[in-house]
């Protein structure tokens, strides 16, 4: 007669993949033009997510919350109330001789 000798040995069933090993590209956010710098119309002043810094005089806000100058002038960072910041652009004083 036939006899079956069934033996089960340890073996590796499958190898899982690591959940690490990827990273998103940096978004290069932050202040691009600082207080006192001279800018031209259209220059980006701040790249941000949300309104950490609010637009002041002569500054507009883009669809992705980017702040940009709408006139040529000098950048000025100011407080807006107690806990908010804003950035404005003031026209350069023309000097006559």
Curated annotation (Swiss-Prot):
One of its GO terms (molecular function) is structural constituent of ribosome. Residues 1-9 form a propeptide. One of its GO terms (cellular component) is cytosolic large ribosomal subunit. GO terms for biological process: translation. Pfam families: Ribosomal_L27 (PF01016). The N-terminus is cleaved by ribosomal processing cysteine protease Prp. InterPro entries: Ribosomal_bL27 (IPR001684), Ribosomal_bL27_CS (IPR018261). Keywords: Ribonucleoprotein, Ribosomal protein. Belongs to the bacterial ribosomal protein bL27 family. PANTHER family: LARGE RIBOSOMAL SUBUNIT PROTEIN BL27M, RIBOSOMAL PROTEIN L27. This is Large ribosomal subunit protein bL27. It comes from Syntrophomonas wolfei subsp. wolfei (strain DSM 2245B / Goettingen).
């Amino acid at each position: 007669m036939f006899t079956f000798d069934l033996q089960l040995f340890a073996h590796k069933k499958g190898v899982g993949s690591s959940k690490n090993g990827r990273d998103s590209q940096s978004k290069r956010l932050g202040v691009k033009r600082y207080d006192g710098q001279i800018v031209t119309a259209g220059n980006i002043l701040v790249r941000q997510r949300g309104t950490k810094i609010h637009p002041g005089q002569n500054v507009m806000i883009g669809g992705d919350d980017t702040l940009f100058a709408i006139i040529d002038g000098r950048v000025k960072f100011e407080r807006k109330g107690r806990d908010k910041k804003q950035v404005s652009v003031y026209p350069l004083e023309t000097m006559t001789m």
